[in-house]
UniProtKB/Swiss-Prot annotation:
Residues involved in substrate binding: 27-31, 77, 154, 209, 327
GO BP terms: protoporphyrinogen IX biosynthetic process from glutamate
Gene3D superfamilies linked: 3.20.20.210
Protein name: Uroporphyrinogen decarboxylase
GO cellular component term, pick one: cytosol
PANTHER family, alphabetized: METHYLTETRAHYDROFOLATE:HOMOCYSTEINE METHYLTRANSFERASE RELATED, UROPORPHYRINOGEN DECARBOXYLASE
CDD domains assigned to the protein according to its UniProt record, in alphabetical order: URO-D
Protein's gene: hemE
GO function term, MF aspect, one: uroporphyrinogen decarboxylase activity
Record organism: Salmonella paratyphi B (strain ATCC BAA-1250 / SPB7)
Function: Catalyzes the decarboxylation of four acetate groups of uroporphyrinogen-III to yield coproporphyrinogen-III.
This protein's pathway: Porphyrin-containing compound metabolism; protoporphyrin-IX biosynthesis; coproporphyrinogen-III from 5-aminolevulinate: step 4/4
PROSITE patterns per the UniProt record, alphabetical: UROD_1 (PS00906), UROD_2 (PS00907)
Amino acid sequence: MTELKNDRYLRALLRQPVDVTPVWMMRQAGRYLPEYKATRAQAGDFMSLCKNAELACEVTLQPLRRYPLDAAILFSDILTIPDAMGLGLYFEAGEGPRFTAPVTCKADVEKLPIPDPEGELGYVMNAVRTIRRELKGEVPLIGFSGSPWTLATYMVEGGSSKAFTVIKKMMYADPQALHLLLDKLAKSVTLYLNAQIKAGAQSVMIFDTWGGVLTGRDYQQFSLYYMHKIVDGLLRENDGRRVPVTLFTKGGGQWLEAMAETGCDALGLDWTTDIADARRRVGHKVALQGNMDPSMLYAPPARIEDEVATILAGFGQGEGHVFNLGHGIHQDVPPEHAGAFVEAVHRLSAQYHN
């Protein structure tokens, strides 16, 4: 087993005792940091940054040099799998991700390959191995993937969407085609995350960014069912240590009980969910991650500290809380405000761990 100097993040996910509440931030390696912008400029474009193991490692480590974070998260993108399937990922200035060859029908789905994690996606595994080497056991490394439903939204819509009419048309008019796509994606994500674990990821997270746009019944059928399949297929031990799994559905606060039934170790909460209520509902089964509104980081540090105190009090005494934002950090947040946030979590949380 590789020694970890700080394992409180992994311990909290497994609801084991910790000295203070661990904290990390979604998108902690990102555009709010001037050093990230410099490295990205050096890489040329976003996917070139993802595909260069040394540069992906550099941006993964940048926030850890600034802040005493309790975990590193692989610098990558959720759309690596659709890109490896041959959909032609590119980024439009101000528009976000787009695909040159979106999925439009069942025949398109049938043609899609299941990517080899050490082949087309080998650059991700190289980044994982490089980051693990450079972390030198300081903190654990989180691997991740998008959920099948969330990946499918981009693949069918051809990019980002506000109304999701194209994928919902497929869902209601040709559900068989969508299920075929989701099944293929579930197999791909399982292989991809297991390869990340074998390469050195010590915890994995599934981001279901768009599950919250579904009705309750559709969420169960088209999103949660496939995440459950992935959880069932994941390696749960590696290097002599349990590998915790976190599920995060943005807008999924009403479905926490169903999510906790998947066998995952933790649930991510967005900021619209009350953490005290979430703990009452599922805290006996899973750890909870979250859940400060990322926009709170625009506030003065004293106000950020008040919000941290409120969320810590909401979760209350005992184990099973990983502090985080309710979604990714915004790109124009002052870096010193992120620092105040991390410092406040550690300082104010000790009283909850006796």
